[in-house]
Amino acid sequence: IPGSLVGSEMCIRDSNKDKDGLSFDVVCPSMPGYGFSDKPSQKGYDSKKIAEINHELMTALGYKKYLVQGGDWGSTVSKWSAELFPNEVLGLHLNLVIAFPPEKDDPMEGVTDQEKVLLGRYAKYLELGSGYFEIQRTKPQTLGYSLNDSPVGLAGWIIEKFHSWTDDEKDKLIVSLEDVLSIVSLYWFSESITSSMRLYNENGREGFSKSKVEVPTGCALFKNEIMLPPKAWAEEIYN
């Protein structure tokens, strides 16, 4: 939440403006339980499982080599793709970089003063803004009954995240209202808000492998990002 394929479509829309003669295919799989993708009928569909499904899809489509890109839970799925299929994944690109303190005597070694400020901002988010995560992780079905029964409730639950997590200016959404409503509508008409939240439960607190990937990695970093881990931490996990 609040991501969806609508965001991917927005990126594709912009990338087509000036390709400088480049030709490439873009495959945007909708994760199980999101949008109009089938809802899992059994447990076990965590980020690792989704990465395996995505690889099966790319193989079936005839791609022997490919790049992966992800943000939010897609970041963990993409990380798993690079870890599980290093011979097929040529590169990993993330717009949410997840990294945690390394397990060594001084985990703050190499962390700059500016990065410490960013860690403080993340700590504030954990204190004041992460309640949604715990609810969706522990009680996705209970919350889903309410959100799936009220379009206003669903819109409020999703749009609040856009206000809190984006670079909005003077309480004005930086994302167009039309695009935001498209995202809300996708969840509403597909009745997928409940099944999408189950991924939080499947992944537990992290849904993330801390093993280092050797696949070349690039990151998009934005000044108001919630999680901006120190470079020294990221280098312990990414190449």
List where the protein language model places each region.
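Single conserved hydrophobic/aromatic residue that forms the stacking wall/gate
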Residues: 1-12
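Glycine-rich "HGGG/HGxG" loop immediately N-terminal to the catalytic nucleophile
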Residues: 22, 31-45, 79
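Conserved hydrolase catalytic core segment
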Residues: 15-23, 63-112
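C-terminal subdomain of alpha/beta-hydrolase-fold enzymes, centered on the catalytic histidine
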Residues: 136-239
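Conserved acidic catalytic loop of the alpha/beta-hydrolase fold
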Residues: 48-66
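Structural beta-sheet core signal
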Residues: 28, 68, 219-221
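The feature captures the conserved acid-bearing segment of alpha/beta-hydrolase catalytic domains
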Residues: 107-140, 209-212
